[in-house]
């Protein structure tokens, strides 16, 4: 008899609507993405960047540790020796479509030249735009230098 009354008064539907109405008047937890952004963790791994020293010289010493450790083989480096005996890169390419953003290149770098920055909005319509050359990586480093420095400082105790 009770089951008959429950089905007659559409008990399940009333319970479902009550639950819906209860959540309808609660505060919203979503954000309006393009206009509001959630905070990013200091350990977030985003778009790659090559850093420079304070005097403007690029940090990369062409040791190729990042190329060797990259599990996706997304990094290609070519280097040449300078007159003073040091080496500098002539080509430093990262294929962002191959990259798995593991951060091993950043961990392997002895001079903190290659880092993964806070930027996560670098979508593109073409594959060639996602193959970053040395100039693009250095531009990213110049653009995000303050954020990268503070990120590395906050992450220092975990390295």
From Swiss-Prot:
[4Fe-4S] cluster 2 binds at residues 70, 99, 102, 105. Its EC number is 7.1.1.-. Its main location: membrane. Its cofactor is [4Fe-4S] cluster. The gene is nuoI. GO terms for molecular function: 4 iron, 4 sulfur cluster binding; iron ion binding; NADH:ubiquinone reductase (non-electrogenic) activity; quinone binding. This is NADH-quinone oxidoreductase subunit I. GO terms for cellular component: plasma membrane.
């Amino acid at each position: 008899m009770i089951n008959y009354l429950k089905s007659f008064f559409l008990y399940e539907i009333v319970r479902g609507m009550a639950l819906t109405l209860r959540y309808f008047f609660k505060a919203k937890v979503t954000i309006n993405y393009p206009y509001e952004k959630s905070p990013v963790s200091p350990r977030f791994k985003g778009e790659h960047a090559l850093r420079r020293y304070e005097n403007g010289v690029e940090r990369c010493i062409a040791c190729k540790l990042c190329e060797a450790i990259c599990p996706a083989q997304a990094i290609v480096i070519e280097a040449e020796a300078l007159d003073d005996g040091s080496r500098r890169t002539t080509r430093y390419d990262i294929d962002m479509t191959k990259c798995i953003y593991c951060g091993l290149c950043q961990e392997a770098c002895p001079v903190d030249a290659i880092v993964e920055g806070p930027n996560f909005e670098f979508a593109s319509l073409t594959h060639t735009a996602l193959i970053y050359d040395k100039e693009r990586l250095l531009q990213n480093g110049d653009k995000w230098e303050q954020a990268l420095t503070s990120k590395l400082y906050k992450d220092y105790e975990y390295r």
